[in-house]
Every structure is written in C-alpha cells, then in structure tokens.
C-alpha cells in the first residue's frame, strides 16, 4: 500500500508542479487553484480505485485477519479522514495544505513503523515531519516538488525496504 500511494502521490505532486508552471507562464493565475485541486482529486480517485481492487484481492487470499490488521485499517481510515478535514480547513483559511498533510502523513507513518518495529518506516515518518516544517519556508511555486520528495522519502523508500523484508521472510 505504501508503494501504491507513494507512486500515485509522487505523480500527483510532479504533475501539479508542471500544471502550475504552465499556468503561471500563461499568467492564468485564476485557474491555478481549480486546476491544482482537480489534479490532486483525479490522482486520489485513481489511487482509491487501485487500492480498492488491491485490497479486495488481498482479502480474498488472506486466511487470517489479526488485531494488527484491524488496527492498521482503523489508523489509516482515520488518517484519510484527517487529510480531508485538514485540506478543507486549509482551503477555508487560505493556506496551502502540504505542511499540514505532510504532518498528518508523518504521524500515521511513524506510528505504523513503531508498531511493527520497522526502522525504515519510522525514519520515513520522521522525514515527513521534517518536510512539513521545510514546507513552511519554501516558495509556493516549489511546494509540489517538495511534497513529491517527502513522499519518496516517507512512503516509497520505506515501502521498498518493507517489500524486500517481506520477500526475504517468504524465501
């Protein structure tokens, strides 16, 4: 799941940067907000569709459902709710969402890593905290690239370490 969302969100961040650069070059400043929101919404929709398909497949193959599985499902469901509420609050207050979104991602990722005692995931979660603070100092023009870098460090790198650890366990 970390790899799925890592790639989806990295793609969203990079495409958002490109969209904003193109709109800025055409001085279409009034379109930046709606296009940015639409870009993120499209990528999230695609991500949720892929996740739904992946989870259905995994649940069909699963023989045992543990309390740990239940805990992680609840943790990430609450995290998704926090993302939506945080985005709504940011839009209402007229501030950019990435610092808050990265903070929320850092919390859930760090807790996940601590719970399964997987150091790369803990480090990935902590990197989200650092990127969250850095996002408050970055020009809005580059915030999408910073967000993509945060996702690579927080989801993709730990996700590949986790995948490798799982494969070594199954050998």
Regions found by a protein language model. Give the residues of each.
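Hydrophobic alpha-helical transmembrane segments and adjacent interfacial helices
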Residues: 13-19, 80-90, 110, 127-140
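Terminal transmembrane helical module of multi-pass membrane proteins
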Residues: 108-171
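Structural signature of hydrophobic alpha-helical transmembrane segments
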Residues: 35-45, 88-103, 148-149
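Membrane-helix interface and helix-disruption motif detector
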Residues: 26-31, 89-97, 139-146
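Hydrophobic core segments of alpha-helical transmembrane domains
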Residues: 9-16, 41-55, 105-113, 150-168
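Membrane-embedded alpha-helical segments of small multi-pass membrane proteins
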Residues: 38, 48-52, 100, 111, ...
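Selected alpha-helical membrane-embedding segments in polytopic membrane proteins
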Residues: 1-84, 88
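Membrane-proximal helix-loop-helix units in multi-pass membrane proteins
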Residues: 64-121
């Amino acid at each position: 799941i970390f790899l799925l969302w890592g790639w989806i969100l990295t793609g969203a961040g990079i495409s958002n940067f490109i969209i904003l650069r193109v709109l800025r070059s055409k001085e279409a400043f009034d379109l930046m907000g709606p296009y940015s929101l639409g870009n993120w919404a499209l990528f999230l929709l695609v991500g949720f569709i892929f996740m739904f398909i992946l989870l259905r497949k995994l649940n069909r193959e699963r023989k045992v459902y543990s309390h740990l599985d239940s805990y992680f499902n609840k943790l990430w469901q609450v995290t998704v709710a926090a993302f939506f509420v945080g985005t709504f609050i940011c839009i209402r207050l007229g501030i950019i969402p990435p610092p808050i979104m990265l903070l929320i991602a850092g919390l859930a990722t760090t807790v996940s890593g601590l719970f399964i005692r997987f150091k790369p995931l803990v480090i990935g979660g902590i990197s989200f905290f650092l990127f969250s603070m850095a996002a408050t100092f970055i020009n809005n023009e580059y915030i999408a690239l910073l967000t993509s870098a945060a996702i690579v460090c927080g989801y993709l790198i730990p996700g590949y370490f986790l995948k490798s650890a799982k494969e070594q366990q199954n050998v």
